[in-house]
Amino acid sequence: MRTRAAFVIGVLLAAPVVSGFSRTLIAAQQPQPAPTPRAAAPVDLTGYWISIVTEDWRWRMVTPPKGDYASVPMTPAARKVADGWDPKRDTAAGEACRAYGAGAIMRVPGRIHITWENDTTLRVDTEAGTQTRLFRFGTAAPAGEPSWQGRSLAQWQISGGRRGAPPAGGSLKVVTTGLRAGYLRKNGVPYSANAIVTEYYNRTNEPNGDTWLVVTTVVEDPVYLNGRFVTSSHFKKAADGSAWKPTPCEAS
C-alpha cells in the first residue's frame, strides 16, 4: 500500500511538469510571426550620405547644353522633346522639379538621409530639390496619383550565410512606378509616366573605415528609351547631419 501510494503521489507531482513541457512544445511548434522588414534587414542603410561624383561630371555637376544626349538610348520622340527643352517654361509651369524625380534624383549631387518611417517603410530625404521618397515593403504598391517620386515597392535581397544561420549580408531592391513625366538629365532628356525605375542599394565597408553606398539605377521606358538606361551613383557615409542643407528644385 505504501508503494502504491508513493507511486500515485509521484504521478500527481510530475503532472504539472509534464503539462508545462507539453505547452512549451506546442507553443514551439506554432508558426511564429514573420519579422518586420526593419527587424529582418540584412544591412543597415540608415544615416546621412553624401554623393561622390567620380564620373559623368559634365552631366551631373553642371546643366549640360541642349543637344548633349550622349550615352542615353533615346527614341526619336525623346530627342524631339529634349530639343524643345526650355527651363524658363518649366519654371513658369511649376515644373522645376522635372530633373528631381525618381528616375534621376540619385544622380543629383548632394546629401541624402535614410531613416525608417515605420517598421515597413524606409524613407529617403534628399538635399537636392528637398524631395522625400518612401520605400514600402510588401506585395503591392499603394494606389495614388502620379508624382515625382512615384510609388516604390521594396524588398531585401539576402546573400551569404548557411541554411538556418543569420544572413551574411544583402542589398535592397526598389521598383518605382506611378511617376510624373520627368527628366533623366537637366537638359531635358525625358522619361515618360510609363517609365519603370529599378534600383539596387548596396553598402560596403572599406578597410580604412569608410562606408559606401552604391545605388545602381535602371530606367526602362517604352516611350522615350529604346533600351535600358543604367547608372551607378556613389555615396560616402557622413558622421552626422551637421552639414545638411536642403535646397529647392531648380530648372537649370
Please place each PLM-identified region on the residue numbering.
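N-terminal low-hydrophobic presequence detector
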Residues: M1-A5, I9
